[in-house]
Amino acid sequence: MCKDIKILAIESSCDETAAAVVVNGRKVLSNIISSQIDIHKKFGGVVPEIASRKHIENISLVVQDAIKEAGVELKDIDAVGVTYGPGLVGALLVGLQYAKGLAYSINKPLIGVNHIEGHISANFIQYPDLKPPFACLVVSGGHTFIVYMKDYGEFEVLGQTRDDAAGEAFDKIARAIGLGYPGGPKIQEMAKRGDESALQFPRAKFHDNSLDFSFSGVKSAVLNYLNTMKMQEKEINRADVAASFQKNVVDFLVDNTIKACKIKKIDRIAVAGGVASNSFLRETMVSRGRENGIDVLFPAPILCTDNAAMIGSAAYFEFKKGNIAPLDLNAIPNLKLGER
């Protein structure tokens, strides 16, 4: 029988300080998250300098809590996994430096993990029997990709945003209609009271049969609509704006993902990233998948937002391939999927 591999994972790419202990890439023994949402809310978004300082304050206790909750000791850990990009450089460095010091002190391998790959790997935790190949829609505040996962750690990008990420567009429109931060959950709640067909906003069209996305156009259209209504001193139905905007974005995401599956002849989609917790996206993707004979997989909401369990899962598969990082590994804020 093969020995179980326990990974201690650390995530600090944005405003969550997180640590987890994961066994064999699929079983979570602990998953501790210290969120900074309440701190950044008053600024309308994440302030990088503040995020870095809070990571410094929190990381040691978060890692200790993860080890304690897992019921293990440091000597039981086989490797230390850590996000080294993409993300906010200062925030990344806090987690990376801590992980390097810890790996050195306990004489265990260091595994560098791509944050986007981590999001995809959250599905291996939710679905322990899941194996590549499959398609994955990664949709979050900073990233929007359609990816074909050929094998563990092997990806082909089929489509990506050419400007704003979907989650970024959610945040900007939420701010514009006075809903505050974080925008995604607030748009979702407001949209439940609105009419999704009340307003027709444009959607980007590419002439090269591309699977790429663009959300700057719909964002600008919503902002122009709001400005026009204000200039004309007309009442704005925020719920209708939220519902119509959300439908526009979700339909774009779903249409391109289904199209990608048909092109690649794939019958299984995994969805990942913070926006994957959006209930309207979940319902629409599952419904469209069923219509097209495609199985649709979503992680639990706690695994959609930034967490270290997903990093532990991705780190396990890197560990199995022998991809050990040097102790001079540096943060790469613009790290691309598939890069090492």
From Swiss-Prot:
Query: Which cofactor(s) are needed, names only?
Result: Fe(2+)
Report if keyword Iron is assigned.
yes
- Top-level taxon of the source organism: Bacteria
What's the top EC group for this one?
transferase
Question: In UniProt terms, what function does this protein have?
Answer: Required for the formation of a threonylcarbamoyl group on adenosine at position 37 (t(6)A37) in tRNAs that read codons beginning with adenine. Is involved in the transfer of the threonylcarbamoyl moiety of threonylcarbamoyl-AMP (TC-AMP) to the N6 group of A37, together with TsaE and TsaB. TsaD likely plays a direct catalytic role in this reaction.
Pfam families the UniProt entry points to: TsaD (PF00814)
Protein name from the UniProt record: tRNA N6-adenosine threonylcarbamoyltransferase
- Cofactor-binding details, from the entry: Binds 1 Fe(2+) ion per subunit.
